[in-house]
Amino acid sequence: MDKFRVKGPTRLSGEVTISGAKNAALPILFAALLAEEPVELQNVPELKDIDTTIKLLNRLGTKVERNGSVFVDARDVNQYCAPYELVKTMRASIWALGPLVARFGQGQVSLPGGCAIGARPVDLHISGLEQLGAEIVLEEGYVKASVNGRLKGACIVMDKVSVGATVTIMTAATLAEGTTVIENAAREPEIEDTANFLNTLGAKITGAGTDHITIEGVERLGGGVYRVLPDRIETGTFLVAAAISGGKVVCRHAQPNTLDAVLAKLREAGADIAIGKDWVSLDMHGKRPKAVTLRTAPHPGFPTDMQAQFSLLNLVAEGAGMITETIFENRFMHIPELIRMGAHAEIESNTVLCHGVKKLSCAQVMATDLRASASLVLAGCIAEGVTVVDRIYHIDRGYEHIEDKLRGLGANIERVKSTGK
């Protein structure tokens, strides 16, 4: 497995170009299964999870080509099963189920894998599809869905706010007969982006980005061209990189209005923030950040995918800060690794109390999930000495060319290729 070797400490400063959002590109790629004409997707990041999704779409009979944009032609889909060998590394594969059963009347997806950060069950996906009229069977590790004719619109009240289940229900309802209303829907910008994509193809979705989404079912979707929105989590990660190192960064091709909760906490930490239509900058003027207290929450609250980065910020900040994780279990697995680098922290249940230290020391550390791996790489950038971050396949799932972008900010980082042994 590849590793990163990071030599610090470094003050990270400069400009970085933000990639397309992984968490929008994935549901949009799966939603392209609904289209009966070719689709061109722009600003799709080059990531392991995107590659896995393209392989999965190809397995189903979809023609997918990458040539700058990603071109998806789902006219000749002739397989309706997402097999275990492709699904096991990526939970997003469940998003194939809704489009398959909506357009073809059948679909089956192996129970998914992905990051080891809690249960994240698929029961809300299943319940939503059943309320649309699908028959669901769990058999031999697969979720199997079928329907005679078209799905039927329904009023669905989500028991719990779920990004994944909101996407599944919304995409399936696009081709359902009648009107579907999703109450207590997730409000993430990536859901709004997926709805905007579907509307480009001829869907009739209103309210995406709020907790009340209405979908007027249509008989078919055509083709179109769509540009994926910028990645707010990547943007936040590079802003934190500058904040923890006393640096200054300008994030270009960003969408600052998706980052309100993160920017508010960075200002609280003492950062000077400036924003434009498609850029955001942070300047620490060489100062240490101040510790902040926060709770993760569904959008528009503080995103769980920025929790690990802010844990690191608190661990090198002035003072002490408390972070409470309300979305996922087991999402403090990076903390013991940071403690090995000299951080002071105490975990109790779903809360971590961070006591800031002036400096971290190098160590060999192991990434456990996508966002935790980013925090360890950033820790290496500011720690004294050479830090080795193992299992970086996690980071390749969600950050496009992160070592190149960090080098552009002055980081001393290299990828050590696996020998294959």
From Swiss-Prot:
Subcellular location: Cytoplasm
Binding residue positions for phosphoenolpyruvate: 22-23
Major subcellular site: cytoplasm
Enzyme Commission identifier(s): 2.5.1.7
A Pfam family that the UniProt record links to this protein: EPSP_synthase
Keyword check for Disulfide bond: no
Residues at the catalytic site: 115 (proton donor)
GO biological process: cell division; cell wall organization; peptidoglycan biosynthetic process; regulation of cell shape; UDP-N-acetylgalactosamine biosynthetic process
Pathway the protein takes part in: Cell wall biogenesis; peptidoglycan biosynthesis
Molecular function per GO: UDP-N-acetylglucosamine 1-carboxyvinyltransferase activity
Binding site for UDP-N-acetyl-alpha-D-glucosamine: 91, 120-124, 160-163, 305, 327
Domain of life: Bacteria
Family annotation (CDD domains): UdpNAET
Keywords per UniProt: Cell cycle, Cell division, Cell shape, Cell wall biogenesis/degradation, Cytoplasm, Peptidoglycan synthesis, Pyruvate, Transferase
Modification sites for 2-(S-cysteinyl)pyruvic acid O-phosphothioketal: 115
Listed GO CC annotations: cytoplasm
Alphabetical list of Gene3D superfamilies matching this protein: Enolpyruvate transferase domain (3.65.10.10)
Chemical reaction(s) catalysed: phosphoenolpyruvate + UDP-N-acetyl-alpha-D-glucosamine = UDP-N-acetyl-3-O-(1-carboxyvinyl)-alpha-D-glucosamine + phosphate
PANTHER family hit by this protein: UDP-N-ACETYLGLUCOSAMINE 1-CARBOXYVINYLTRANSFERASE (PTHR43783:SF1)
Family: Belongs to the EPSP synthase family. MurA subfamily.
NCBIfam families: murA, PRK09369.1
Stated role: Cell wall formation. Adds enolpyruvyl to UDP-N-acetylglucosamine.
Listed name of the protein: UDP-N-acetylglucosamine 1-carboxyvinyltransferase
Protein's organism: Photorhabdus laumondii subsp. laumondii (strain DSM 15139 / CIP 105565 / TT01)
Gene field: murA
